[in-house]
Amino acid sequence: MLKTGKGTEQEVVQVHTRKSSRLFTFFNSQKVVPYVLISPFILSFIVLSFYPTVQAIVMSFQRVLPSEVTFVGLWNYSRILNPTFFTALQNTTTYMILTVVILVSIPMLFAVLLNSKVVKFRILFRTALFLPALTSVIVAGMVFRLMFSESDTAVANQILNWIGLESVEWRYNAWSGMFLMVVLASWRWMGINILYFLAALQNVPKELYEAADIDGANVVQKFFYVTLPFLKPVTIFVTTISVIGGFRMFEESFVFWEAGSPGNIGLTIVGYLYQEGIQQNDMGFGAAIGVVLMLIIFVISITQLYLTGAFKKGDQ
């Protein structure tokens, strides 16, 4: 017997309903839901990070010209071994070490101080410390350039003259140029790191401090034996992002010297990449510099995490 049109329509609706129900059940299962929720991040990572990284690696083996692209093998990497790159590497490493020491130790101490009952108006201080991170680096750099200009009327030189010292040409000496970059970076990011440590301090049980007081522990002993162990995870995190940020630094150098610093005293690896890849339009060589920088950051970060015990299990 032939089925009526009405019966056929009902069967089609039932088939679609069953398919929709299976699809709904599939996407709501405990095994699939986590992947559905993180899929936007995965897609954005592939589009914004993974693909550009692969493209940069491919480009580092090429000579990229406006009219043609030629495969040159390791030629771009062989060109990296030059005095200018080693100067940039030395400047970047020095900057990274100084900023890591400052942006880990000082924010930790400030956070402990702000978390105590000694300081009044703690909420006001926390808000004020976060404001530098919201300030444009270009605006902050221009203010710092005025404060540390070469004239005797600059704020920094007036202070030096007031205590009996001579004026300094801040942007024309190696030590003072490094000082400017480190001070600007510390001013920008110290507040955020303080907030990281403050958040971690909220997880320290107050009972431990009370027990330490009963045992007669002083302030220093309570810091090293009670506070510091609970700050280890966030200390590893802050150290890692400070190391990565130190090697990726570009803005602090650019706002002080723009086109180039005298004697390359402010040249960093990213600045060297910008000069060669963008200004000189040598995209292949610039990509090779970027790949080398990525490898340096990866090796140092993994080594630092291993030495600090970040890969060990919690019960070890």
From Swiss-Prot:
Q: List the PROSITE patterns hit by this protein, alphabetically.
A: ABC_TM1
UniProt-listed InterPro entries: MetI-like, MetI-like_sf, UgpAE/MalFG_permease
> What biological processes does GO assign it?
transmembrane transport
Q: Where in the numbering of this chain does the ABC transmembrane type-1 domain appear? A: 89-304
Where in or outside the cell it occurs: the entry states:
Cell membrane
So which domain of life are we looking at?
Answer: Bacteria
One Pfam family of this protein, by short name?
A: BPD_transp_1
Q: Which residues form the signal peptide?
A: none
The alphabetized UniProt keywords are: Cell membrane, Membrane, Sugar transport, Transmembrane, Transmembrane helix, Transport
| Gene3D superfamilies (alphabetical) | MetI-like
Q: Give the family from UniProt.
A: Belongs to the binding-protein-dependent transport system permease family. MalFG subfamily.
Its assembly, as annotated, is: The complex is composed of two ATP-binding proteins (MsmX), two transmembrane proteins (AraP and AraQ) and a solute-binding protein (AraN).
> What's this protein's function?
Part of the ABC transporter complex AraNPQ involved in the uptake of arabinooligosaccharides. Responsible for the translocation of the substrate across the membrane.
What this protein is called in its record is: Arabinooligosaccharides transport system permease protein AraP
The record lists the organism as Halalkalibacterium halodurans (strain ATCC BAA-125 / DSM 18197 / FERM 7344 / JCM 9153 / C-125)
